């Protein structure tokens, strides 16, 4: 699926530098779940290396940046950032990451991704720019993509936090294996998200180090770059907090399971002791010697009731002295 959009730049806020000089609009080409031939064709049309398009199919491709000039001398920036996906794509209660491939020129941005209708991409397509976020160049639009991807990570971490709380509550009251299996899924998500967010932050730093050499408007840095960095730092902090919670949850789960098993063993021990009384009584009256009540027509009933009464007395004694609590 191909999505095409022409974005008009904000002329009042436009800074004058080598990136935005006299450029009034941007063409954005967005490809979702494209086939390899489609990716190859569009890259060849702009005289770009076709291997750039191969990375979109590598689920484990990490975030990085590269600069390239084509035969016409046009500068293109090739960027990969990692976005999260979860219940929209997979059935597990966890998150994975996938690469968003960005090819940026002066008046052109091309993006490629393997998934369709991702919430953060729908926001980008609606051009829901944050307040005081001037859209002045292709670089600004790419920064907006970084912003939305950071927001997607924050949303994913928020959902993961709820899953962690749910697993914690289940671990308090269960010794079943499904709690451990749920915790395994919960463990996977923050690992993927943590790696992706840290890689994205490094790529953001590298791209800004290069383009800030061309940028003279300090207001732009305050309005755009700082907004993106704040969102990225928030995502990093939230993920680190969740990683710490999961580590504690792992320890807590081990302790809770151990305590629950101890409680089960205590109950079984009490039952065993109580059941020992009628067992011993039946053993004594089963001997082939003269025994009390052997000639009494109600002897069996008397012995049975006596055993039950004795078992109840033993139970209350154990309960009274808190022997197994």
State the predicted function of each range:
Residues 84-87, 94-256:
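Extended amphipathic alpha-helical scaffolding segments in membrane-proximal extra-membrane regions
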């Amino acid at each position: 699926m191909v999505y095409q959009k022409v974005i008009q730049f904000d002329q009042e806020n436009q800074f004058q530098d080598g990136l935005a000089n006299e450029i009034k609009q941007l063409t954005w080409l967005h490809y979702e779940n494209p086939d390899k031939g489609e990716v190859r064709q569009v890259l060849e049309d702009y005289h770009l290396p076709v291997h750039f398009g191969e990375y979109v199919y590598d689920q484990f491709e990490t975030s990085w940046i590269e600069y390239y000039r084509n035969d016409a001398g046009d500068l293109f920036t090739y960027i990969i950032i990692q976005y999260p996906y979860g219940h929209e794509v997979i059935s597990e209660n966890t998150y994975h990451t996938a690469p968003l491939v960005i090819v940026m020129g002066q008046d052109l941005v091309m993006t490629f991704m393997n998934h369709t209708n991702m919430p953060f991409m729908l926001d980008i397509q609606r051009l829901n720019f944050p307040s005081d976020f001037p859209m002045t160049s292709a670089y600004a639009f790419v920064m907006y993509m970084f912003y939305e991807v950071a927001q997607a990570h924050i949303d994913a971490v928020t959902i993961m936090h709820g899953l962690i709380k749910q697993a914690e509550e289940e671990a308090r009251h269960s010794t079943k294996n499904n709690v451990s299996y749920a915790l395994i899924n919960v463990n996977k998500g923050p690992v993927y998200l943590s790696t992706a967010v840290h890689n994205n932050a490094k790529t953001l730093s590298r791209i800004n180090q290069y383009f800030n050499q061309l940028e003279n408007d300090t207001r732009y840095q305050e309005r755009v770059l700082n907004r993106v960095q704040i969102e990225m730092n928030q995502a990093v902090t939230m993920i680190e907090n969740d990683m710490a919670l999961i580590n504690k949850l792992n320890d807590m789960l081990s302790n809770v399971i151990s305590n629950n098993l101890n409680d089960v063993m205590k109950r079984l021990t009490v039952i065993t002791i109580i059941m020992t009384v009628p067992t011993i009584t039946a053993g004594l009256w089963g001997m082939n010697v003269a025994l009390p009540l052997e000639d009494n027509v109600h002897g069996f009933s008397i012995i049975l009731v006596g055993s039950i009464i004795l078992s109840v007395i033993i139970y209350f004694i154990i309960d009274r002295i808190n022997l197994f609590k």
